[in-house]
Design a protein with these regions (language model features):
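Short solvent-exposed coil/turn linkers within tandem alpha-helical repeat scaffolds
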Residues: 9-17, 46-58, 84-93, 119-128
Length: 141
């Protein structure tokens, strides 16, 4: 833990630090320590953000923040993590936005995001899963 702290504090803007944070956040999530994992992914997002940051790592951090926040019922936090993404993003981002919007009760907007996900997914199994989410929202209206 001491080496981890040294790496992630003193060398926070390096690829090694990013990978260490990514690994730790993933390990904590696997151990079902979602709050701890969320904290690590926020640290990763902050250190990889900005002009000299790393866009790929930042996107991974934001996606994980959104996933974990949704699992914890923190739907507004999930939306905040995803707010930088426009409508030209990948299918999974649209699905996450739909999940978060559904969680805050914005069902019409959630359905729009789910529809965008279906349009962009190439895997029929994933399309069917998102269709179920839409059907569930329409049934509950």
């Amino acid at each position: 833990d001491e080496l981890f702290e040294d790496l992630t504090v003193n060398f926070s803007n390096t690829g090694y630090s990013y990978l260490a944070l990514l690994k730790k956040g993933s390990d904590l999530a696997k151990e079902n320590n979602l709050e701890g994992s969320l904290e690590v992914f926020y640290q990763l997002k902050e250190s990889s953000d900005g002009f000299f940051g790393n866009n790929l790592i930042n996107d991974i951090a934001r996606t994980n923040i959104a996933r974990i926040s949704i699992a914890l019922g923190l739907f507004e936090d999930a939306l905040s993590a995803l707010e930088k993404y426009s409508n030209d993003e990948d299918a999974y981002t649209h699905e996450l936005k739909g999940d978060a919007l559904s969680g805050v009760g914005s069902n019409e907007l959630a359905i729009q995001q789910y529809q965008s996900a279906i349009d962009k997914y190439t895997d029929n199994g994933l399309k069917n899963l998102v269709e179920l989410k839409i059907n569930n929202l329409e049934t509950n209206e």
